[in-house]
Amino acid sequence: VRFFATAAKGTEPALRDELRELRLPGVRADRGGVHFEGDVGHAARACVWSRVAARVLLEVTRFEARDGEALYEGVRAQDWTVWVTPQTTLAVRATCRSSQLTHSQFVAQKTKDAIVDLLRDRLGDRPSVDRDDPDVGVTVHLAKDQATVYLDVGGLSLHARGWRALAAEAPLRETLAAAILRLSGWDRERPLVDPMCGAGTLAIEGATWARKLAPGLGHARFGFERWASHDDVERRAMAELRASARAQALPAGPPVFASDVSPNVLALAQRNARAAGVELVLERKDVRDLGTTHPPGFVVTNPPYGERLDGDFALYDGMARAFKLLHGHTVAILAGTPAIETAMRRRPDRYWQLYNGPIECRLVVYSIE
C-alpha cells in the first residue's frame, strides 16, 4: 500500500529523514510531503512517532479525471464498504492544481456523492457528513487532470499534540517547530535555549524530542481506528504500539531554557510545558540581556516580525549583538523578514527556505566562534 505524509512547505527533507529513522519502507521526498510504503501498521507508527508530518494519507486509487463524470466514476469504482458504513460519518477535502476541474468544492462534492451513492445502492442506506470530526476523512488531490484519492490515517491534523492551552499571538505550529529543530542540527544533548519563547512551542518540542516522548500519544484515537476495516488484530497491535512508545520515554533530557519579556506568555509557556509533561527553565528576560550556558548551548528562536514587532527594529540589532557574544554556541533563527539577517551582519553557515503558514521565512544557522 502507498502512503503520503504531508509536511509544511520546505520541511520535506526533515520529514524524509525522520521517516527513515522510523525504518519505514520506500521513503521518498516529494513536493508537499514524503511517500512511503507498507501496511496500516507502518502508517500507525508514523502517526505515533512523527513530529514533522501534518497528515498521514493512505492512497486508495489514482485515475484521470478531466471532468466531473470521470471523477465520479473513478471514485465509485472503489469498494468503499471496506472502510465506510451507513453508521460512520464522512468528510471530503479536495485540492486542485493545473487541472480542468478547478473548483475544490465541486471536486469534494462529486467525490462524496460517488461514495454515498455506492453505499446506498449496496447497503440500502448512506453515511452522514461530519466536517468537524468525521470517522472517515477522504482527501482528493487533482494535479494535471490526475486524481489521487486518499484516506486520512491520522484523522485530526497531527500537529495537535494535546498540550497547547491557548495560542499566543502568531503561534508556531508544533510540526514546523519540530522541523526547525531537526534541520538546524540540534543533537538533543546540548542545552537548548529559546530567548523569545512566546507560548514555548520550540522549547517544548525540543524537550519532548530529547526525552523520546511520542507526539502521537496525545491522540486518543487516530482516524483509521474508526474505519469499518479496523479489527481486533489491529486493535491489539495499536495497544502494543502505544505501550511500547510509553516505555521508551526517558526520565530526563538536557536543560531547556525559555525566556521572554512578557510575563503573560511565560505563564502560557509554563502551562503548556506542564501539559506536555516536560520541564523548562523559564525566566523573564529581554533577548538583549541573554547570557551564555555551560556547556555552550544551542539557541533556536522565532523572533517577532510584522505586526508582532510593532515597528521595534532596534530589537534585531540588540539581538544580533547579544548573539555575537555567545562564543562556542550555535544560533538558529527563523527569520520572517530580511531585516533579521541584515542585523546579524554575516552570512549564515546553513539556511533553508520555509513557510510559517503563508509567510515565507528563512531558517538561518550560525556557528558563533
List each language-model region with its residue ranges:
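SAM-dependent Rossmann-like transferase core, predominantly class I methyltransferases
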Residues: V149-G185
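Accessory substrate-recognition/RNA-binding modules or partner subunits associated with SAM-dependent
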Residues: R2-V136, L142-K144, V153-H159, L166-A167, ...
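Short amphipathic alpha-helix with an adjacent loop that forms part of the alpha/beta core around
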Residues: T81-W83, L290-P295
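SAM-dependent methyltransferase catalytic-core segment centered on the flexible catalytic loop
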Residues: L213, H219-A243, H294, Y305-I340
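Conserved S-adenosyl-L-methionine
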Residues: L172-G291
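Short SAM/SAH-binding signature in class I
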Residues: P296-N302
